[in-house]
Amino acid sequence: MKDKLVKAIAKDGQVRIIGAITTELVNEGVKLHNCAPTAAAALGRMLTAGALMGTTLKSGKDTLTLQIHGGGIAKGVVVTSYADGHVKGYIGNPTADIDPNSKGKLDVSGIIGKNGNLLVIRDMGLKEPYIGQVPIYTGEIGEDLAYYYTVSEQTPSAVGLGVLVDKDLSIKSAGGFIIQMMPGADEMLADLISYRLEEIPSITEMISKGMTIEEILEYIFEDMDLKILESIAPEYRCDCSREKVERAFASIGQKDLKEIYDEGKEEELKCHFCNKAYAFSHDEVGDILESYYSEK
């Protein structure tokens, strides 16, 4: 089934919903980083969350970056997303893997850790990006994002994220949703939705059964006048380039660049998001030094 993201409303706009199937997207990211099962689940949940949240950006030039650092062996997860649904990300330690939790599920919170923060960074081309930050609530990512929305943006929200890793380490199913109550929404409606979310199967189970994202949302919001407003094809896509990597290389500073140049060696840099390698010869390091740091 092709990945798909939809935006919707229910109950005459009292509820705002973003839902997506992200199996192919997550599979791409997990393969690029050669993730162990628990690391794959953590990265996959973050990629799915990024795809969902990125579509709330107003401009194609805006970016949304999610970071979670909890002191665990995952060594943090970083995801950057865009308004068109494309997303990229990495996990600090792709080999992070521990025994399943008490429910027999991949122990994402166990590798993320709980001693740290979740950050949401919106860069809208202004002088400074907007940074929202909350302490990690559980380390399961979905609950942490729901906590972020409630505390930092004062928007009561339910966030469901799921990644099912197959025996061959491929992604069998992945997806998620963000459900938000709009100002003035009926409190009994919020209670009803909470009850339904407790009763439904997991999103990965529904995707594995072949349900589309529209069918999943219709199932959750039965008799609530669900209206699909927009659909997008989310994808994993890195936009790195030699020029961007060169700028990042130059930013290490004149002193460090001079040391690298004086050693006379070729320098290789890898993109965090896609692992593509960029080699800079001794002469090219010299050119960067001259271009960025020579006195005009």
UniProtKB/Swiss-Prot annotation:
Its main location: cytoplasm. The keyword Zinc applies. Keywords: Chaperone, Cytoplasm, Disulfide bond, Redox-active center, Zinc. InterPro entries: Heat_shock_Hsp33, Heat_shock_Hsp33_C, Heat_shock_Hsp33_N. It is found in: Cytoplasm. GO terms for biological process: protein refolding. Disulfide bonds join C238-C240, C271-C274. GO terms for cellular component: cytoplasm. Under oxidizing conditions two disulfide bonds are formed involving the reactive cysteines. Under reducing conditions zinc is bound to the reactive cysteines and the protein is inactive. GO terms for molecular function: protein folding chaperone; unfolded protein binding. It holds the Pfam family HSP33. Belongs to the HSP33 family. PANTHER family: 33 KDA CHAPERONIN (PTHR30111:SF1). Redox regulated molecular chaperone. Protects both thermally unfolding and oxidatively damaged proteins from irreversible aggregation. Plays an important role in the bacterial defense system toward oxidative stress. This is 33 kDa chaperonin. It comes from Clostridium botulinum (strain Loch Maree / Type A3). The gene is hslO.
